[in-house]
């Protein structure tokens, strides 16, 4: 296992790496981190690329990145070269075409790019939670940041796109009223659902049976899985789920266990 490639193939973008966006070992693992790690894993393990560019903010992040890449290359017959980028290394970033960010906040990166030329490279962010104050602020700030039409904010569903558009429309109306000027520069908002590696979700009947036994779940019992955080202010409100479970429990009372 090493970092010396056989060729110089590389993707059409570099990745912004900060450990928090890809960390699945902490006590409070969030969906954005699981998605970030899965994306990093797919890029590193892909046989398509032997050279990857990473936009970093210091030596500490560089070490953490190298550790993560070594972990992902473990038992994987592949060599890869890591190219480290900084905000001032514009020519190198430009050679990749752009920077892929693990979150929706493009403002800081757009401000850094502005010193060297808006058209030097693209920025591409992605949404996860959209109902938190910080994320809504990041989205509304797109209207007053040096964002260009060749930038993008990936929306992971139709509902996310609707949310993003409502935030932008509300902020646009406010700014038009405040400054008597319509702001037209917005990023592209493509809908690209999060993907998964289906090969990681193959469980045989023995595994399923043992898992149910460990949780004391009988064969006829019904298992309800809520995928996500029970957070009323930043995720889906949990009351509708509780109401539905209550209705199911009453209907199946004495018949099957939920």
Spans of model-derived segments:
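Helix N-cap/beta->alpha junction signal
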Residues: 57-58, 102-105, 156-159
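Short helix-capping segments at alpha-helix termini
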Residues: 73-77, 116, 174-184, 248-256
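Conserved catalytic-core segment of nucleotide-activated headgroup transferases in glycan assembly
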Residues: 197-258
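N-terminal pre-catalytic "stem/leader" segment of glycosyltransferase-like enzymes
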Residues: 1-93
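Donor nucleotide-sugar binding/catalytic pocket of nucleotide-sugar-dependent glycosyltransferases
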Residues: 148-210
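Well-ordered, non-membrane alpha-helical segments in soluble/globular domains
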Residues: 29-41, 62-68, 169-173, 209, ...
